[in-house]
Amino acid sequence: MPGVEVFDTPLGSVELDQNLVNKIAHLPQIVISREAHDLEHSLEVQLPFLQSVLGKFTLLPLAVGFTSAEAVADVLAHVWGGEETLIIVSSDLSHYLPYSIAQRMDQETMQSIVQLQKLVEHDRACGSIAINGLIVAAQQHHLTPHVLDL
């Protein structure tokens, strides 16, 4: 967690959900690290879109480092809510490949996710640990993924 109370965007501030922050702060997987969030930009580029679509909401930003998918799923289990809870895992999938190869690899990765296969490899997706953690959580909650776009 970043150790801040708000994330600022050109559209205004998004407050952190302090109830959820307090709910998971004691977990051994959780570390307060502003540096981890300073080096990562995936959330910042999505926040204005989320503000436009959702209006006012609270946020629990988690940067996932080197850990197991099960450890990520355990943290998600502590914050799993009802329909009011939106869990987003961000990935830009393959990197620095010729377009046709990237398309094929990204399609294969997407199929692994949709089929809830948890072994998305590091070389196939930036954020593979977080993706795999969400796959484990989806399996535990008997969810069925649906592809919106790729």
Where are these predicted regions, by residue range?
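Active-site histidine-anchored catalytic micro-motif
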Residues: 1-150
